[in-house]
Amino acid sequence: MKQTVYTASPESQQIHVWSLNHEGTLTLVQVVDVPGQVQPMVVSPDKRYLYVGVRPEFRVLAYRIAPDDGALTFAAESALPGSPTHISTDHHGRFVFVGSYNAGNVSVTRLQDGLPVELVDVVEGLDGCHSANITPDNRTLWVPALKQDRICLFTLSDDGHLVAQEPAEVNTVEGAGPRHMVFHPNRQYAYCVNELNSSVDVWQLKNPHGEIECVQTLDMMPADFSDTRWAADIHITPDGRHLYACDRTASLITVFSVSEDGSVLSVEGFQPTEAQPRGFNIDNSGKYLIAAGQKSHHIAVYEITGTQGLLTEKGRYAVGQGPMWVVVNAY
């Protein structure tokens, strides 16, 4: 299995392309100059394209991924109705979802042969919209509205339109600020990191109709932490055994173990990391975690070790200015 790591640095308007080997070493393959401040990125389900959101001219760009080394070639672009904060796709590669924090909306762009061709839907009124997350069955889009302390639930129609479910939303505790999410591989649980109180909620998917319930909320900060809480990102290993979330003020990654059924999280430890970790990701083998320091202008590679999933630093690498996003592609 070959793996490529992509890092987005908006201040220098660059994407760095890295080869990741089995020992956790990165080798630089390419530096792409992007026409704008590049932030969110996602790889298409078929591994052939990288979709990125840029500003101040709000667009989604599509880059072809070379099958031999992961290098990027620009392919297409499509306009967006707001500054892109988060980008994702449905599991069949038919649509791109973009959440916009500043515009307070989520948009759906249709893909044709892997390329973005037209905007098909926009839902407004999502104050502080910070991500858009399709359920494993490709039926329901979960959209955290950070400033409203709610997660809105939409059914994805065959033509890409979003229809509010019943109930149309669930609420977090006041002041939590739901931000980013991941789903457990067993498809029965989801985990949402809350930016403003640096906690993680465990949501149970109770039935195929989209009904969900919060079954656990866990503080992700050390007991003696007294500064402003500012959580950012969350990811789970492919086997569902370990979960990680980061806080930018503390510049740390919290390590969680996940119960066998996915319903219970336990804090296993805290890993100091690059200054102001805005984004990170886990490789497809579940062996390495790559974190980006927005203030250090570096990324760090960690090996995931032992039954607790604790992190051991393998190396750090200079990237562009203000790195914010990391994605990993395997082929």
Curated annotation (Swiss-Prot):
GO BP: any one term: glucose metabolic process
Q: Which GO terms describe its molecular function?
A: 6-phosphogluconolactonase activity
Which reactions is this enzyme annotated as catalysing?
A: 6-phospho-D-glucono-1,5-lactone + H2O = 6-phospho-D-gluconate + H(+)
The record's Gene Ontology cellular component field reads: cytosol
InterPro entries documented for this protein: 6-phosphogluconolactonase_YbhE, Cycloisomerase_2, Lactonase_7-beta_prop, N2O_reductase_N, WD40/YVTN_repeat-like_dom_sf
Keyword Hydrolase (UniProt): yes
- Could you list this entry's UniProt keywords, alphabetically sorted: Carbohydrate metabolism, Glucose metabolism, Hydrolase
User: Which EC numbers characterise this protein's activity in its record?
Assistant: 3.1.1.31
* Highest taxon of source: Bacteria
TM annotation in the entry: none
Q: Name one Pfam family in it.
A: Lactonase
Q: In which pathway does it act?
A: Carbohydrate degradation; pentose phosphate pathway; D-ribulose 5-phosphate from D-glucose 6-phosphate (oxidative stage): step 2/3
- UniProt cross-references to HAMAP family, sorted A to Z: 6P_gluconolactonase
Q: What does this protein do?
A: Catalyzes the hydrolysis of 6-phosphogluconolactone to 6-phosphogluconate.
- Could you tell me which PANTHER family the record lists for this protein? 6-PHOSPHOGLUCONOLACTONASE, 6-PHOSPHOGLUCONOLACTONASE-RELATED
Family indicated by similarity: Belongs to the cycloisomerase 2 family.
The protein's name is 6-phosphogluconolactonase
Source gene?
A: pgl
